[in-house]
Amino acid sequence: KADLGQGTTGRYHGLLHSGGRYVVSDPGSATECAEENEIVTRIHADAVEKTGGLLVVTPEDDLEFSDQWVEGAKKSKVPFEEIATAEALRREPRLNPGIKRAFAVQDGSVDGWQMVWGAAHSAIEYGAKVMTYTAVTEIIREGDQISAVVAHDLKHDERIRIDCKFVINTAGPWAGRIAELVGCHDVDVVAGRGIMIAMNHRLVNTVINRCIYPADGDILVPVHTVSIIGTTDVKADDPERLAIPRNEVQQMLDSGETLVPGFRDARAVHAWAGARPLFKDKRVSSTDTRHMSRGMSILDHGSRDGVNGIVSIIGGKLTTYRLMAKNVVDVMCEQLGDDRPCRTADEAVPGSTVGKNYLITHRLGENEERRAGTGLVRGGDPKAVASSKKIDNQVICECELMSRKMFTDLLADQPDATFDDLRRQLRLGMGPCQGGFCSMRATGVAVEEGTIDAERATGLLRLFLKNRWIGLWPILYGEQVRQTALDDWIFQGTFDVEHLPTPQQEVEL
């Protein structure tokens, strides 16, 4: 109903699981993660950084649990290697020097938005149509058979009917609501809210896990130019309304100190919350989301509810998304009598076919290649200067090295996109200034290119700033307070953004 990756998929800490986190608490999920980790790293190479991971026993942790962990890892077939604590500290000098034991695992970091768009582009190549900002309002059935889906195009305020023979419900924490539209009740999906905080630089270059039973704030992940600490796990009544309580922010900062002493001295730049879609487990309390399984559950509503042509899949993890898709589509194919093999484990998505994994230096490299191609650095072709537009190399966002051409190319391809839609693909406004400088530049460029008029530009800018502020309010301390105050003075004192004319209608998602 919104942009790709705007729900649960894009609201997490960026971890591609090795399985190590779950070898004791959820062995089945651990094995799935271990198997899918290798596949996802290969088929989504441009979205995955092979950082590796360390599970460490901190001074606050029970050393005996590490023995359980070793046995669990062996049984779950999760690859690991125990290394000396001195070696762990050599690899990550900021780690707590009091660690008592360390294990190297195959964790990685992944750009969830890049992964989702890669999968979408692959589907489009096979004939799929991707419809963003389109909310399902009705599912039509003829007797006990699904026949159509009705949706509302939020951007154009249009009703859309899609005739179909089969529906796969993959709505995450909203899956229960979708099932109810067709009369399938009691699909008990519990939304487990978790908050995360991005710090302004990489405190570590390896994923760091505490070697404990899964708990709050026990993972630190290097993602792009930042480090992300997470996460809490609290039942949310409504996945649309996810609070970021200040006490949980303090809890995350304290947890960061346990892993990396001095963590609080680093600059927090943004906080956010996501909702895990957990299938209700009768073995645990309905509010105890931390101990609900991270495994996937497929519900065949034909045998369960007497409604044919619809299945729901609930739970799982981003790391196992491909396996989830395979399993649920296998069920659909079986019911439709379409016997065909799944090829997703072997076929890379567009952008990853060369098999080169993401590196944090990738934009520096791309910038150098562009400059070389325009003759601006030694080795470049001088003849290319005449035919190139040097302005294309203008940097719009210094924090994330986003060039003007990157922005204008994507805007031309997606003219109806909001600046937040573009942010998810380009990382616009995701550095320390949180859009304070780059958002105004991007707005001016969009108007200059003729893609949008001044009125809509103002509306998009205000929406972008509003969404950035949601993640700033809970972490206003230290240097980020000064930055935020400066940004506010610029937008209110210089541009008077609050009082500029905006469009009558704008989808605020």
What are these regions (language model features)?
Residues 1-11:
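Glycine-rich FAD pyrophosphate-binding loop
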Residues 13-15, 48, 95-98, 302-307, ...:
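Short, flexible turn/loop "capping" segments at secondary-structure junctions
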